[in-house]
């Protein structure tokens, strides 16, 4: 039976409670975003966030419900409507710290659209996406997150690369050694990519990232430095070659 919290919200204590609470949200979160529907979708997402904060993450069927609502959450994250996008981010901000490592099924569902927002010129969208990513990196400690971030470091957007680099630092600061050992090669690849990044903020973050890495894996430092030097030399060689080819119209 549902009980009520001091602020009047329903406390979710069982799968049955959650089923009742989301019954009115399901048809709304299946809607396509239009001028007529977006406000209803926004309200439904806000209601789901309240349920998330009121115990829903502790009942087994919550994960199933997130899978069900994931398409709507992802679409809303990428919406051009700032309010709707912000509400979708708020859902993740409440979800990730409470789920922790149980967030695993949603890494490849929600991380890509959040990273996509980091490539946008809208600063509000960028900061919101970074906040969500930081919370996920800080609380979820899932190795696959690193693979997503390394992939982002190869993209053209400088703001995306800088955001991904900062997420790498937060992830390393939040995880213990045993968790990081599983994906240390991802960290090393990130350092090599960032060491030659054109964006000054990304290079500055690389120094911080390397400092964390060197402290945790002192026995691997020498190899990493050699690989970084090799990468830097290769990049410089290619740049000089391209300059020469252009100069002689080759």
Placement of each model-derived feature along the sequence:
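Hydrophobic residues within the alpha-helices of tandem HEAT/HEAT-like
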Residues: 47-53, 73, 77, 87-99, ...
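Active-site loop segments of alpha/beta catalytic cores
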Residues: 103-106, 118, 122
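Eukaryotic acidic, Ser/Thr-rich intrinsically disordered low-complexity regions
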Residues: 2-7, 188, 192-250
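Core helices of alpha-solenoid repeat scaffolds
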Residues: 15-29, 51, 59-74, 92, ...
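Short acidic, glycine/proline-enriched loop segments that cap or flank alpha-helices
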Residues: 57-61, 156, 175-182, 197-201
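Short inter-helical turns and helix N-cap capping residues of alpha-solenoid HEAT/ARM repeat scaffolds
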Residues: 36-37, 80-82, 121-123, 156-158, ...
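N-terminal "cap/leader" segments of large eukaryotic alpha-helical scaffolds
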Residues: 1-56, 236-250
């Amino acid at each position: 039976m549902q009980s009520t919290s001091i602020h009047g919200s329903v406390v979710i204590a069982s799968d049955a409670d959650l089923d009742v609470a989301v019954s009115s949200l399901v048809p709304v979160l299946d809607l396509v975003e239009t001028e007529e529907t977006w406000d209803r979708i926004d309200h439904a997402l806000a209601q789901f966030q309240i349920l998330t904060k009121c115990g829903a993450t502790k009942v087994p069927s919550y994960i199933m419900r997130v899978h069900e609502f994931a398409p709507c959450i992802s679409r809303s994250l990428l919406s051009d409507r700032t309010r709707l996008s912000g509400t979708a981010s708020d859902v993740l901000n409440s979800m990730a710290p409470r789920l922790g490592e149980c967030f695993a099924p949603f890494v490849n569902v929600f991380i890509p659209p959040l990273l996509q927002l980091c490539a946008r010129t809208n600063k509000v969208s960028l900061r919101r996406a970074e906040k969500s990513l930081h919370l996920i990196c800080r609380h979820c400690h899932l190795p696959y997150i690193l693979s997503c971030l390394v992939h982002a470091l190869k993209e053209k957007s400088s703001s995306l690369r800088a955001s991904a680099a900062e997420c790498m630092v937060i992830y390393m600061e939040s995880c213990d050694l045993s968790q990081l050992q599983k994906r240390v090669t991802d960290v090393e690849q990130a350092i090599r990519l960032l060491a030659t990044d054109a964006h000054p903020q990304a290079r500055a973050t690389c120094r911080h990232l390397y400092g964390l890495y060197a402290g945790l894996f002192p026995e691997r430092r020498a190899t990493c430095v050699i690989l970084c030097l090799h990468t830097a030399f290769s990049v410089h060689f290619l740049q000089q070659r391209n300059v020469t080819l252009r100069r002689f119209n080759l």
